Amino acid sequence: CRRACEKLMEDRRAGKQLKDMKGIVYYGEYLAKTDPLGANVPNPVSHVAYGYATQMCVLNPKDGKLELMVAAHDVGKAVNPLSCEGQIEGGVVMSMGFALREQYPIDENCKPIQKYGSLGLFRAHEVPKIKAIVVDKPGLNVACGAIGIGEITSIPTAPAIADAYFRYDGIRRYNLPLADTPYERKG
């Protein structure tokens, strides 16, 4: 947590060397201020978000297959830009599966009834071009300026793909995996 890192940095600024800090544990806690569920306030705060992400899907006009995914993510200061790009690409590919093919049926005891290989995961040769845009904003005064790049990479993918198909054929799709696409699994 950022507050623990700030305590560590206080020791570093005071002249402590890393080798002398071995075994020291730093604790920190952050509790976001949110409104209770159902609060009768004009603009309730239900959660705290640190990053922002947006994605766009481009379909091939001839066959309706994904041609390009553009994913822009505000990460604050990109401490490792190449790693950020990889995280974005991985999140997009994972969510393409959620959006278009993956099904994870379970039995009445919540036990999977399909093998991993038959879930509908995208294979490398099926993945479209992905343009990962790391929005790097230096100057934030927290955690070396980094905001983070994790789960947020997979959130905008399905809506972007659903919107691309709506623009392609005028059909709104409300369930995942999306029906009536070239990726729909038969049977």
Report residues per predicted region.
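C-terminal catalytic domains of large/alpha subunits in multi-subunit enzymes
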Residues: R2-G187
